[in-house]
Amino acid sequence: MIRPRKVFAQHWLKSEKALDAIIKAAECTESDRSPKGDCILEIGPGTGILTRRLLPLVQSLIAVEIDRDLCQLLSKQLGKTENFLLLQGDFLTLDLPSYLVAFPNFQKPNKVVANIPYNITGPIIEKLLGTIANPNPEPFDSIVLLVQKEVAERLYAKPGSKTFGALSVRVQYLAECELICTVPASAFHPAPKVDSAVVRLRPRKIEIPALNPRQLETFLKLGFGAKRKMLRNNLQSVIERDRLSHLLEQLKINPQARAEDISVQQWVILANELAVASGEQGVGNR
């Protein structure tokens, strides 16, 4: 048995209950995009406990693993499975479309199902969804991830809650986020110091595009930079307080509101109005 390596933040999932929840959330079925079944991308398959559960349910599964020892183990155990493709490398730097050119039997994945390393959760989600300025032009149907519970709470947080922050806005601008279940630390070997949670992201068409996505990013950084302060104080470096207060009233936003009190759509509308007022409209996204 290969021991988990700290350098890759490895923790082996051992809970059948958690595996069942992940499989159910993935909703592996035939669809218009994949009439023969789903094509799954798994990031960090580890010893393959989730991989083995998924393979009989899908058309194909592409696993990306950075650990060479685990790649050897998976190749030995699953290498002859026709619908399984293993790629050794760092997912964050991997150009998956270029790799798949050499494997015509494996089409572009339409879903992601993964127990990802918690220390690179943010970069992984950004690569899967894109950013406010550059959304993924070919979004996945769904993304099911096992992440740190604290991060999950920020992903699906609602306006007005203490956990609603810039990450909440960035992710919810691009996708609907749903909490599937929580997973205790005891479900892993070795047990991490934190509990975990399964979340499902469904990329969506952006309802109100940001006129200047980069400016929206700037407003989010400023707005959430000091969460205890009122928004009009945090944004006074880019717009006069009185002018901002008037604009907030026009948008039916409480002038005394803090950053976490404003919904995703309100953030976009506010940024768009400020962009128009300052003459800094850019090119919107999809």
UniProtKB/Swiss-Prot annotation:
InterPro entries linked: KsgA/Erm, rRNA_Ade_diMease-like_C, rRNA_Ade_Mease_Trfase_CS, rRNA_Ade_methylase_Trfase_N, rRNA_adenine_dimethylase, SAM-dependent_MTases_sf
SUPFAM superfamilies referenced in this protein's UniProt entry, alphabetically: S-adenosyl-L-methionine-dependent methyltransferases
Gene Ontology CC terms: cytosol
Cellular localization per UniProt: Cytoplasm
Entry EC no(s): 2.1.1.182
Binding of S-adenosyl-L-methionine, residues: 11, 13, 44, 65, 90, 115
Gene3D superfamilies: Ribosomal RNA adenine dimethylase-like, domain 2, Vaccinia Virus protein VP39
Reaction(s) catalysed (UniProt annotation): adenosine(1518)/adenosine(1519) in 16S rRNA + 4 S-adenosyl-L-methionine = N(6)-dimethyladenosine(1518)/N(6)-dimethyladenosine(1519) in 16S rRNA + 4 S-adenosyl-L-homocysteine + 4 H(+)
Single GO term (MF): 16S rRNA (adenine(1518)-N(6)/adenine(1519)-N(6))-dimethyltransferase activity
UniProt keywords, alphabetically: Cytoplasm, Methyltransferase, RNA-binding, rRNA processing, S-adenosyl-L-methionine, Transferase
CDD domains associated with the record: AdoMet_MTases
PANTHER family documented for this protein: DIMETHYLADENOSINE TRANSFERASE, DIMETHYLADENOSINE TRANSFERASE-RELATED
Family label: Belongs to the class I-like SAM-binding methyltransferase superfamily. rRNA adenine N(6)-methyltransferase family. RsmA subfamily.
HAMAP family xref list: 16SrRNA_methyltr_A
Cited function: Specifically dimethylates two adjacent adenosines (A1518 and A1519) in the loop of a conserved hairpin near the 3'-end of 16S rRNA in the 30S particle. May play a critical role in biogenesis of 30S subunits.
Protein name: Ribosomal RNA small subunit methyltransferase A
Upper classification of the organism: Bacteria, Bacillati, Cyanobacteriota, Cyanophyceae, Nostocales
